[in-house]
Regions:
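Gram-positive cell-envelope targeting signals
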Residues: 1-52, 216
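Generic structural signal for short, solvent-exposed loop/turn connectors between secondary structure elements
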Residues: 152-159, 204-211, 230
Length: 230
């Protein structure tokens, strides 16, 4: 009887291991999409609340304090268009609205992010041929994302309007901050156990958007953050 060489035996074992990992991955994905999804996600420490399914506890006034807060949070993702792209969760929100968030930061605190000599000197040491006066530190961007969109980690990438200077840790743009041209018109606003759920439209230049539904998760300190837009 011929004996299998050590190399062939090792290759076969490696192949079986890879096959087993693939099967486990397929099984895990099917569980995440099936009836056991909530249980599986809970094991991994993911948010398992179905916020859209929460029953309304009370209706809030569209001209009240909460309404004003949420309208301002809508303004963070609005710049020069009344048409918004739906999202769910922090990562997707940042991927879609990175430029809009940075633009809102520049718009709200122009003097902080323009002409900051300390930031300019820091960047020029790493990018000596780059001439820019607009710089937003990645830490500032992360703080804004955590405050208004939740999450625990933020990716940093260049967008269309803002470029990420990875070696210096700053965002920069040659463009001026765009003003928010749209008005938020609230159609319905409800409070649930864990959220505020708001239906609204955007209006600008005589045009009105489709009706959007936004869900904001409440924090214990009275603040809230974006969860989803539909």
């Amino acid at each position: 009887m011929r004996r299998m060489s050590h190399t062939k035996l090792h290759t076969r074992r490696l192949g079986l291991t890879v096959l087993l990992l693939i099967l486990c991955s397929v099984l895990l994905v099917s569980c995440m999409a099936g009836p056991n999804a909530m249980w599986i996600r809970g094991i991994f420490g993911l948010d398992v609340n179905d916020y859209f399914a929460e029953a309304p506890l009370r209706q809030l006034q569209p001209d009240g304090t909460v309404a004003a807060l949420l309208s301002n949070m809508v303004g963070i993702i609005v710049s020069d268009s009344i048409h918004l792209t739906p999202f769910s969760g922090t990562s997707e929100a940042v991927r879609i609205y990175r430029d809009a968030i940075l633009n809102d930061m520049l718009r709200d605190d122009y003097s902080r992010y323009t002409g900051n000599r300390q930031a300019i000197n820091s960047v020029s040491r790493v990018y000596p041929y780059l001439s820019t006066s607009t710089l937003i530190a990645k830490d500032d961007f992360e703080n804004v994302v955590f405050r208004y969109f939740g999450g625990t980690s933020v990716s940093h990438k260049s967008g269309t309007a803002f470029s990420y200077l990875s070696r210096a840790g700053y965002y920069t743009s040659p463009l001026q901050a765009r003003e928010c041209v749209a008005e938020v018109e609230i159609r319905e606003l409800y409070e649930t156990e864990h959220t505020y759920r708001m239906q609204f439209v955007l209006t600008a230049n005589g045009e009105t958007s489709d009706i959007y539904t936004a869900v904001f998760v409440k924090r214990n300190d009275g603040s809230c953050y974006w969860k989803a837009l539909r």
